[in-house]
Amino acid sequence: MPKNNSDLMIKKIIFAAATLLLLSCGDNSRVIEENVLPTPMHIEKASGKFTFDGGIKIEINAPVEDSIRLLQALTDVGITANNNAGKSITLLLCDSVAGITSPEGYRINTTTKHITAEGTNGAGLFYAVQTIAQLYNAVNCIPCGTITDQPRFEYRGLMLDVSRHFFGKEYVKKQIDAIARYKMNRLHLHLTDAAGWRVEIKQYPRLTQFAAWRSQELWKDWWYGDRQYREEGAPDAHGGYYTQEDIREIVQYAADRYITVIPEIEMPAHSEEVLTAYPQLSCTHEPYKQADFCVGNEEVYTFLENVLTEIMELFPSKYIHIGGDEAAKASWPTCPLCKSRMKEEGLANVNELQSYLIERMERFVNSKGRSIIGWDEILEGGLAPNATVMSWRGTDGGIKAVHAGHKAIMTPGEFCYLDSYQDAPHAQPVAFGGYLPIEKVYSYNPVPDSLTPDEAALIYGIQGNVWAEYIPTEQLNEHMIYPRILAIAEIGWSPQEKRNYEQFRTRALNAVKQLRRNGYNAFDLSREYGNRPPSLAPNNHLAKGKKVAYATGSPYYPTYTAGGDSALTDGIHGGWNNSDKRWQGFIGRGGIDVCIDLEEEKRIKSIAADFMQLCEPGIYLPAEVEISASADSSTFHTLATIGHNVVRDDTLSLKSYGWEGETKARYIRYRAIRGKQGGFMFTDEIVVK
């Protein structure tokens, strides 16, 4: 017990000072590893530290444009120049830098009085500044020694979907600031989709006078409602768009931070908004009828070329994204113009007809000195000669692309779709579905093991995508982006052999604190709930390891086997994600009808199975479950019939259908029947106790 209040106060001051020392470079050993994200390629440590006190002399030896950008980057984090100071930061543009092969690489040498950063390109020096800034913000010093660093991949991107819900210019610039801090260099803007056209095209004013505005503010209300568009200025019009001046401002703002903005203009699908504003570009020539352009109509190519001409004037990026995904092609087989086009061009099917459009648009874009990116569906029907593939439906698209000698950007939904839940659904805002915690994002390696070194070199990079169907606000958008985009950043930058999740998590926790201090609505990683508790340990029960027989007409779906015939009695429960290879999926009319052989008669007190509902991808709870038991597998007596009124909602929910009582049986029959809505049923384990 302290002698008096003065003693207590002195102890508090000593403790606070010791804590501050630990937070301010007092121990050099882990400062860089815990605060620089992405983790650097190589660190050589020396004794001592450079502290940011008493003013800093700043010297920059680079072209004027780079010098202005670099000085601004230092100023933005609070490092200001004092030409009379005894300490200095020197940024040098060099012809070559030891240990660096990438133009985005850098080398920082630190003594107690001087920091010298070298790079062969303005971008490299900019990333050196980001490393300096992270340490300055975190601990107000830099340990002495040398950091040699460069990116693993050339393309390190974030995609913002600004169609499903529109996010304004200042918000986009704010995200540019954040991703630049973590050495990301591409911002992909998904500018067009059914939910709204978001960029001014002067030759086609109806795209922003009409196609940019819809009848409901929330995408889900509009999509499951009337799906009507509105005139700009109408009382019930919701939406927005970027003027061409807005785009120029965003592009320049990004360029000043060494980020390239890549525009996406969807074709031939996801174009309801265009075809309602300009219905003559569809196969039916009627508004509100089509999502796909009429590929046989020559006017479509005139429209697309005119749009892309204005887009390329606004966006100087080498790459233009032209979509190419999820075309229904429903009207093409019967459309006279499409049929005529197929005959004239000798096209065998509608997949080749889509490839005709993609290849033709590629030739146009190439003629302007640019190249195209498309979602992996552009592989169907033949890949355009110079296209880069963005692989989202798993990794197969990327593998096929590099096998054919094309570049691939890896963004598989399983690891890179940041619109999925990042924590337990009950603790998070409603999301599109799935469960993608930061640890799983971080586990992804964009280079498949099956690739040769030459093929691996064609993996251009990685991208995190934030689809906004269920993200109506800027605050929620940030919550979904951060901190998971930090995992994407480190995957894209750091050597594979340097990556370690526990060490990354420490960096990410520190980064989240900084992001929140800077006004970003980042998810608080320190309060992560984690995966579904039953999934964390095996469940030992009477049916574990026992044989399961599936009735004719009740097979599990090939994509969701969860390991096959043993899945429902393997003792392993699923997590929050139906795609985690633990949930078995059923879609046939027979529903679920299985029989478990316990091998001998057992005294049984309970039988239960959990089911998942996630309506957006079409996963529903059973409308009815029947549980029965038998001693001989021929005569079954019903233990329970459980009905349920299936109601569509937005949230992920789990429900247990079970029986409790007392019986003896060797065989357990478990049947689950779908409701009128159809869709999938998913269950993970039939637990018998």
Residue ranges and their predicted role:
Residues 25-156, 372-375, 379, 383, ...:
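Acidic, contiguous N-terminal accessory segments
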Residues 371-377, 382-387, 393-538:
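Flexible, acidic glycine-rich loops studded with aromatic residues
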Residues 576-640, 651-689:
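Aromatic, loop-rich ligand-recognition surfaces of beta-strand-rich domains
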Residues 537-573:
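Predominantly extracellular/luminal regions of secreted and cell-surface proteins
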Residues 96-319, 335, 360, 364, ...:
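Feature activates predominantly on carbohydrate-active enzymes
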Residues 274, 284, 289-385, 392-395, ...:
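Active-site neighborhood of glycoside hydrolase catalytic domains
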Residues 1-34:
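Bacterial Sec-dependent N-terminal signal peptides
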